[in-house]
Amino acid sequence: MDQFLLDELAASVAKRPAYWDRDFSSHEAYVKSVEPNRKRLAHILGLRDARTVFDGLQLDGTTATSSLVGQTDRITIHAVSWPAFRDVTGTGLLLEPRGRDVVANVVAIPDSGQIPEQIAGLSLGLTPELQYARRLAESGCRVVVPMLIDRQEKITRLTRREFLYRSAFELGRQLVGYEIQKTLAVVDWYKKSWPAKPVGVIGWGEGGLITQYAAAVDTRIDAACVSGYFDSRQNIWQEPIDRNVFGLLEQFGDAELVSLIAPRPFIVDAARGPEATIPGGRGAPSRVVTPALGSVKEELARAERLIEKLEPRAKLRLVEGGQKPLTGQALGQFLKSLAADTALGQAGENNITHLRKKFDAAPRHAAQFHEIDRHTQWLLRESPFVRKQFYKPDTSSVAKFEASNEKYRTQFYDDVIGRFDRKRLPLNARSRKIYDTEKWVGHEVVLDVFPNVIAYGILLLPRDLKADEKRPVVVCQHGLEGRPQDIIQDDHRAYHDFAAKLAERGFITFSPQNLYIFTDRFRTLQRKANPLKKTLFSVIIPQHQQIVDWLKTLSYVDKERIAFYGLSYGGKTAMRVPPVVTDYCLSICSADFNEWVDKNASTRNPHSYVNSGEYEIFEWDLGSTFNYAEMAGLIAPRPFMVERGHYDGVASDETVGWEFAKVRFLYQGKLKLKDRCEIEWFDGPHTINGKGTYDFLHRHLNWPKR
């Protein structure tokens, strides 16, 4: 499986041209021709919130402190903030030249491990030659330096960036998208106030990431310079998870982003970048490394090949030969791309004195952190209304409902789960007997699915199965870190051998092995899949389709009576596989059904995943599309059941009831299906109860009780 995804990642580069239709007849035609790709990039970056229009930056001072935090005979530096979107602001510094005209307007973005004061010369950490915001201001530029959220750990062993990324991702937003919006809000102000003045964006490390994306999505930016970041993105799954962009590599690597910036000047400073190792804990293990020079050159050469037909040629520049980021050569080229007649001034010798003697950056960072969290939580509260506008099947009749539901099924598979565009392999079934009991016989089964991908499970056949008899099948699914064997023997506290007990009742059962096993090993699969616009279920669904197709070839299986029953992560499977594998005639979700979007995005809900170690669990933009009620809608009109223990820590009873009420209303209120949707509440924990669900199976699979 790992090799399959690595192969898909490698193949993604060659598949990208299919998404582009570049017109090289003129610069204007070219820019217009790549606009659909630009819009797609903005969408996957989560740039959906309307930015606030404003007339000027706010000078951040009080009766006790001035907004003026530093000045020399060449520049002034003010603490500033500005509206970005809704109630979210940007904050940082404004540097302006003294005694001369402004030649260009610039946004200079530090790495997330830096504070604005460092690149402005107000704080320790950088020598004057590396204080690129200061040097640009001293050379005649007006410069705004925004603050980024840092990557320090919270007390929960989770970085601040990952914490904010998690809930935003579930709601179709990105932390990097929020920071791009803050940058573009400054660009809005620049263009509104000085429409004829050139605008440039420059950044190092994480600031380079924001620079590159901002320049790619906004053509008003006249030039961009990226230092310590530009590289092949094929190993993005090893980078911090807050850089994870769902579907990025489907259309975009860094070379393709450059092709969106073209024909505008783009400078790559192949200098040392930030370096860090994030061990994980509750968060995703990752690393930040300096891009290798060879890789940088190769990716830039690929960009040049993508736009080689563009005339006049795009102005791409590579600066190499130095480890120090954004020093003379790179900074000089960036300045000349904005103001050709302006030379970069010499670096000063000393830092600038900070006029706030007891300056502490921590309160500013905390305020920005909580603003972003509050905005995302507001999106969460609004999301039920967004989904209600999104999911509108025709419920005037069951037939019309089924027909109108197909477009949502397609969207769910293509845009939420992610569909691999490849044919499944022939079944090539292999089996061996591994159980021989008084009431049933068990066989291990292996099926081919894709290259380097198999489906594996255990088939249990009741001993009283007669020749020429066709019986119903229940596909029984284990949970997180589980095995098929766990639901067959040894009376596991959660499973209680439910696959074996159903076989004792006369059902044929099949217990597949799903991918969610071996902790970071399977979570890394999700990380490799996401940039391809795929998920773990992009593989699990074809595996289940192959299983169902194989079951249908067995002479003793009734093709119309194949049911699904899963617990915990298997219940998560019950909500995602039957909507797509419609061969399943019913679905039972045990110990998982809840208000899933809230569980993934809430920073208040005590049951939330936001502070958990399950960093793979978050799914792109479910908040705007499919919560569990909508997923159940894709199962309808087939029978659907929830098994819920009062003391199951997955969620509270009231949360489960809230979401289930929507499903019940669809089945019984709108579609008038009185007997196909139910929930069993029982006095117990996270476990198979095996009472109401067994009755449900007997009734809907038309199999007598024993």
What are these regions (language model features)?
Residues M1-G90, G172, Y178, L184, ...:
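Alpha/beta-hydrolase-fold serine-hydrolase catalytic core, especially in secreted/extracellular enzymes
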Residues L95, I109-P110, P146, I202-Q212, ...:
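Generic beta-strand/beta-sheet core signal
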Residues D101-S193, P198, W204, Y229-R243, ...:
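Cap/lid segment of the alpha/beta-hydrolase catalytic domain
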Residues V103-A104, S139-R142, A196-P198, T219-A223, ...:
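Loop/turn elements at helix/coil->beta-strand transitions in domains of secreted/extracellular proteins
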Residues I119-T127, F163-Q181, V201-I202, Q212, ...:
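Alpha-helix capping and helix-loop boundary segments enriched in small/acidic/polar residues
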Residues R134, Q212-Y213, S259, A399, ...:
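Alpha-helical segments flanking ligand/cofactor-binding loops in enzyme cores
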Residues D150-R151, E275, Y516-I517, Y565, ...:
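Conserved beta-strand edge residues that scaffold enzyme active sites
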Residues V186-L260, D549-L622:
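Primarily recognizes the serine-hydrolase "nucleophile elbow" in alpha/beta-hydrolase
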